[in-house]
Amino acid sequence: MPFDVILFDVAGVLLTNGWDRGERAAAIAHFHLDLAAFESRQLAPYDAWERGWTPVTDYLDATVFYEPRGFSHDEFFAFMLSQSQLQPDGALGILKELAASNQYLLGAFNNEPRETNEYRFQRFGLRELFQVTLCSCYLGLRKPESAIYQQALGILGRPAERVLFIDDRAENVAGAEAAGMKAVRFEGEAALRRELEALGVF
C-alpha cells in the first residue's frame, strides 16, 4: 500500500459548507437581519468558535443577539444546522469504499466549530467511517496554518510521506504538501477516483 493514512476534508469534499457565505446569507434573509452588519461582526468570533475557544452561544451573542430579537438562540442555530447537505458530486462513496476495505487508517482533517462538527458527523454517519478526527475545534489551529499539519502528523504517529490528504482548497493542499504529505485537490468524485487509482490506493 502506498499510504498508511488517508485524511479527508469534510466541507466541500463530503458535505456542503455548513456556514459559508451562502449559508450565512440564507439565515440572515430567513430571520430578516442585516447581512452587512452581520458580516462586519462575524470574522473574529467565528475564528474563535472554529478553533474551539468559545461555544456557539458566544458566537451568536456577538453576531446576532447583541440586541433583542424575536427568536431564540436555539431557533437560529437550528436553521444553521439545516444548511448542511451532502456535497453534490462528493467523495462520500469513495470514503465508504475505503472504509469497507479496512486497508487504511481513515481520518477527518477539517476546519469546523465543535457544535456543527458533532452534528454533521452524527447526521451523515461520518463517525462510523473515520477512526480519527483532526478538527480545528479540537486542535485550536486551522488549516492552512503550518502548525496544524505538524500537530496532525504527531497525533497520527506516521511519517508524512505515508499520509494522503484530500481537500478542495488549494491553500490547504499546499500546506499539507509543505509538511511532506501527499495531497490531492478534490475536484469531483470521478477525478478523485482517477487520482487514487493512479496513486495505487484502489
Predicted ranges, named:
Residues F31-Q42, P68-A78, F202:
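Short, surface-exposed acidic
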Residues M1-L43, A179:
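Active-site neighborhood of HAD-like aspartate-dependent phosphohydrolases
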